[in-house]
């Protein structure tokens, strides 16, 4: 399972709630929040699955 984060980071994310679960076992509210965290982690954070952790 993967997410294309090539257009991130973005300065602001919408409040849209479409949860994704990161490899850090944290539920991110949407792809934007998740991708910003991926960029911040220098690519060490990956997608575990779609939906809550």
Swiss-Prot record:
Q: Which GO terms describe its molecular function?
A: serine-type endopeptidase inhibitor activity
Q: Which cysteines are joined by disulfide bonds?
A: 5-35, 13-32, 21-53
Name where it's found.
Secreted
Positions of the Kazal-like domain: 3-53
Which InterPro entries does this UniProt record tie to the protein? Bifunctional_prot_inhibitor, Kazal_dom, Kazal_dom_sf, Prot_inh_Kazal-m
Attached carbohydrates are found at 42
- Any one annotated GO CC term: extracellular region
Task: Name the site position(s) for Reactive bond 3.
Answer: 15-16
**Keyword Glycoprotein assigned:** yes
| Family annotation (PANTHER family) | OVOMUCOID-LIKE-RELATED, SERINE PEPTIDASE INHIBITOR, KAZAL TYPE 2, TANDEM DUPLICATE 1-RELATED
**Protein's name in the database:** Ovomucoid
């Amino acid at each position: 399972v993967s997410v294309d984060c090539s257009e991130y980071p973005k300065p602001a994310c919408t409040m849209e709630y479409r949860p994704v679960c990161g490899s850090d076992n944290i539920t991110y509210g949407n792809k934007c929040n998740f991708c910003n965290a991926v960029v911040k982690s220098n690519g060490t954070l990956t997608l575990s699955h779609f939906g809550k952790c």
